[in-house]
């Protein structure tokens, strides 16, 4: 039985993998086996960190909002603000509130003060 030379098929497959790993350091960008291992590892990490990124940004937004609210001097916290926002049925999510907190603190103070006034007024009159 004669040996069949496979031509460029294997080389094309390896160069495709090498293009993915061209920015890796050392043997991770030169040796085929380590390239394939590092490619798998990189894809796993990117998939995992896409979910983590959502969590981390939510934590960051909550921290920013809470810092600005507590800085205002009123005994008001993040959890009360969010609770009152839901009571008022305002469609301001945490990302928007964090952007407002960074760019214009006074605007966030005004929003929180208006919410406090309306919720306190409704509770005192017995509407809620």
From Swiss-Prot:
Protein family per UniProt: Belongs to the bacterial ribosomal protein bL20 family.
Primary location recorded for the protein, binned into one broad class: plastid
Entries under PROSITE patterns matching the protein: RIBOSOMAL_L20
Localization, UniProt: Plastid, Chloroplast
Name of one Pfam family that matches: Ribosomal_L20
Cellular component aspect of the GO annotation: chloroplast; ribonucleoprotein complex; ribosome
Organismal lineage: Eukaryota, Viridiplantae, Streptophyta, Embryophyta, Tracheophyta
Keywords of this entry: Chloroplast, Plastid, Ribonucleoprotein, Ribosomal protein, RNA-binding, rRNA-binding
Protein name (Swiss-Prot/TrEMBL): Large ribosomal subunit protein bL20c
Functional note: Binds directly to 23S ribosomal RNA and is necessary for the in vitro assembly process of the 50S ribosomal subunit. It is not involved in the protein synthesizing functions of that subunit.
Xref: InterPro entries: Ribosomal_bL20 (IPR005813), RIBOSOMAL_L20_CS (IPR049946), Ribosomal_protein_bL20_C (IPR035566)
Entry's Gene Ontology BP terms: ribosomal large subunit assembly; translation
Molecular function via GO: rRNA binding; structural constituent of ribosome
């Amino acid at each position: 039985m004669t040996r069949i030379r496979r031509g460029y098929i294997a080389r094309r497959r390896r160069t495709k993998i090498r293009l993915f790993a061209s920015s890796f350091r050392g043997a991770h960008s030169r040796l085929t086996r380590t390239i394939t291992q590092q490619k798998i590892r990189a894809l796993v990490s990117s998939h995992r960190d896409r979910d983590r990124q959502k969590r981390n940004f939510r934590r960051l937004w909550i921290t920013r909002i809470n810092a600005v609210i507590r800085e205002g001097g009123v005994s008001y916290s993040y959890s009360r603000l969010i609770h009152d926002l839901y009571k008022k049925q305002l469609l301001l999510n945490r990302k928007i509130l964090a952007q407002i907190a960074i760019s214009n603190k006074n605007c966030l103070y005004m929003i929180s003060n208006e919410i406090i006034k309306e919720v306190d007024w409704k509770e005192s009159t017995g509407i809620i």
